[in-house]
């Protein structure tokens, strides 16, 4: 207002001067003010006096910017025009500020000077008024907001060089008055360039500030520092507020969901409260039903239907910010209808529709509603499921029960009874098998071998129990006292010089095990006679008789049975009182009371003295010791209790029943052959050995010298000194019989090799044949295995039932014996057992010490 008064006063002053002086010069504006960027035009009136002499002058009007003193534009007046109006267009005024209009005359004739004068006018230009507005963006872009720029002033249509404006947005998290008491505020600035328009929306992205956000908008002209307009800081929460989004009316089934829509660039954090709208009574307070807190960033919450009353009622929701208790969102109300229709609890399952196989069971629930005529509970009131009981084929009742069958109970009873029955069956079977093994199984007896020997009518060669029942547990001797001279193979040192035992092929194992029990029962009659002979021997001992005994080693070849020694034994010990008391039940012996001593036999030698300390002696024909004997050696632990006799010179004797007639017999040929018998024996030996040599390496020499014996003793690890060589082993005698030490070493190696095999397979009735197949590795030079091409049973079938006479089977010798038919049947043990071609597991029926 003051500038206008000043201009008006200046104008009056000019008019007065002109009137007084009679000559008026002035420059006058029609409008004292102007709006920049507007489409208004500025008009300037002028008047000047050219002088008394009428000299023409050039006059111009300049538009100057007062702040910078720069000329915006210049306009020239006509020479013959002393007064008039000049028009200045809108595009000259792009920026607000102070402008000057100046009129300056110029002389046309330089020769005539004139005084300088200048007229001017002042113009004030202002910015147009722009209104700034903020708005939410579309839902698809919740992280943005819009800035609106609007003006009511018409803008100048710039023909060229149209100016641009810049919109700056500043985000802060606090108000300026709150910054003094808090830490440094967060401030984020963003700008956008836009064209000059009377109204427009400019979209901006949000800056992450938090639950509180303030925005300041600044509008500038591009390239200029002047600010057209500035708005802010604007509280976005107060500007936009929080909105609760919900349907106006709903039927509550499980819950009511309320969504909070926060202001732009603001995160939700507060409490949603629900209350029932109270009647409009004075003094009536609003009842708050529940409050749900929303953590930072969470927008949705659900209220359970149990909070609302049955029927249709109006409920209102409100959102408040805990940090700004003075501010709350606009209250939103809605109608909520809650029906009474709801489901009750499920009833128990019904019984299965079938007693076996697949059935169906059902359960129901009831709809609880205030309108029983038309229940509208959502869901199913009936539920069915399959129930599977036991299969019909597995359990069928004998008669249908009138009562309702209890499927699960009966099924459990069947399982229980079945389990108990199975357990009882297993227990009974275990007890029966144990009793059968302990009492019902016969003794596992080996198949005895044939013996081609004949003895005196009063004595007959017997076998110890270990030869008959090797696989069974150790029992006492057949004698009453049980003190017979027994011993493990490692405890006896009898030089069995001439003995041959053919190995048995491996195919005899199966047949031998099958006929084992039947063969073991057939040995009972001979064993009865052996026991009777023991009783008669004790009667002779009671009378103080002495006897001449012969110790033989019996093998499958009777010719190679070896006489150990012949010595008059000491008078036998008298019986114990218990035995004397039982004499009346025994059969008297028919033997004479004088001792029978053979004149041709040598006295006891050192052989008998070191019997207990000599190593195990075995026939040369026996390549390996039997597995049962090896087992007895290990179980007895060195010299066994049964192996050592009470009297070192005790020998077992036997006799037949008193009713038996004495049959013709011949003296058995000793191992020391006469010159008359040597050629025939040697020929048979060579014939048999030729048949065996086909199955073993030709590495053994024809003669076994005494120095070889020492080597074998060292290789076999003997337990004691070996017996001296018999007389038949001389350097000049061409006999093919091996030495005792030869197979004594093989015995030790055989035990070491057969024991792991037996531990792996267990005891078998046919283990003898397996052990005989293995050779005794003494040295690489003398390692061989004796294999017979034909078994003894095949020889019996092909040649003769008792003794074959073919030279190839020389181990069955008939030339030196004359046996009756009864004696041959008695001695033909394999034939007596009824062995066939498949049962070839015929082994010797004697231990290494047999006394006749």
From Swiss-Prot:
TM region positions: 414-434
Matching InterPro entries: THSD1, THSD1_D2, THSD1_D3, THSD1_N, TSP1_rpt, TSP1_rpt_sf
Chain segments carrying region Disordered: 444-517, 624-799
Effect of residue 460 to W: In ANIB12; uncertain significance; decreased function in endothelial cell-matrix adhesion; decreased interaction with TLN1
Signal peptide: 1-24
Any one biological process term the GO annotation gives: focal adhesion assembly
Compositional bias of kind Basic and acidic residues: 655-669, 686-696
Gene3D superfamilies given in the database record: Thrombospondin type-1 (TSP1) repeat (2.20.100.10)
Chain ranges on the Extracellular side, renumbered to this chain: 25-413
Domain TSP type-1 residues, every copy: 340-393
Keyword vocabulary terms for this entry: Cell junction, Disease variant, Disulfide bond, Endosome, Glycoprotein, Membrane, Phosphoprotein, Secreted, Signal, Transmembrane, Transmembrane helix
Residue ranges, compositional bias (Polar residues): 670-685, 766-778, 785-794
GO molecular function, one term: extracellular matrix binding
Disulfide cross-links: 352-387, 356-392, 367-377
PANTHER family: THROMBOSPONDIN TYPE I DOMAIN-CONTAINING 1, THROMBOSPONDIN TYPE-1 DOMAIN-CONTAINING PROTEIN 1
Record protein name field: Thrombospondin type-1 domain-containing protein 1
Native organism: Homo sapiens
Gene that this polypeptide is encoded by: THSD1
